Amino acid sequence: MNLTDKTVLITGGASGIGYAAVQAFLNQQANVVVADIDEAQGEAMIRKENNDRLHFVQTDITNEPACQNAILSAVDKFGGLDVLINNAGIEIVAPIHEMELSDWNKVLNVNLTGMFLMSKHALKYMLKSGKGNIINTCSVGGVVAWPDIPAYNASKGGVLQTDAFYRPSIIAKHNIRVNCVCPGIIDTPLNEKSFLENNEGTLEEIKKEKAKVNPLLRLGKPEEIANVMLFLASDLSSYMTGSAITADGGYTAQ
């Protein structure tokens, strides 16, 4: 895949899909910088992986100076930045008529504004270096709205509009590509927590019920989304920009 010695910055990389991506890129001999708000998880990841190619920087992606610092940390640590993966995200379950404004703003600030801030400062570096690759973690919720998570759906719909954010026709001239992946329901710790908080039954029972929504009749694995990210980061996808890959077990094809 030709990712050896490439430097990849992953937001929300200390758990779930992000952590699976960290491991996938390390396996390809890439340098990986994780920007995550959870310092304890980040430090635990560093100890577990014990890899000189991995670096952690505690980052609140809703804070612009913190985002700028994350980009600079990647450049200072490994000498450049080849790939930015905007993966950090949250969801709050509540129908729109019951959702607090503070919760609405929190979701949009992390999922949408955080992506904007990280991309803004990554692009400043990539435009100067004449190359780069941005991968955004969207969601099926940005294509077909999930019930009772209106802020999440709205934020991911914004993420999907890569043309509006990045103007691929302009930045492509500088050898910069931008694409996104739209996962379906993935078996992550964050989703497990949400399942138990918002459904009745055991975790195993809830997972079986959730799996029925797509033709493959199972939840996705974080590693399966990480594999899509590897493809988008590599030369195998060199003719792709402004595209979205849906990995949802066939949910949106029904």
UniProtKB/Swiss-Prot annotation:
**A Pfam match:** adh_short_C2
Q: Name one GO molecular function term.
A: oxidoreductase activity
CDD domains of this UniProt entry? SDR_c (cd05233)
Catalytic reaction annotation: L-dihydroanticapsin + NAD(+) = L-anticapsin + NADH + H(+)
Q: In which pathway does it act?
A: Antibiotic biosynthesis; bacilysin biosynthesis
Checking PANTHER family in the record gives: DEHYDROGENASES, SHORT CHAIN, ESTRADIOL 17-BETA-DEHYDROGENASE 8-RELATED
Q: What is the protein named?
A: Dihydroanticapsin 7-dehydrogenase
- Specify the species: Bacillus amyloliquefaciens (Bacillus velezensis)
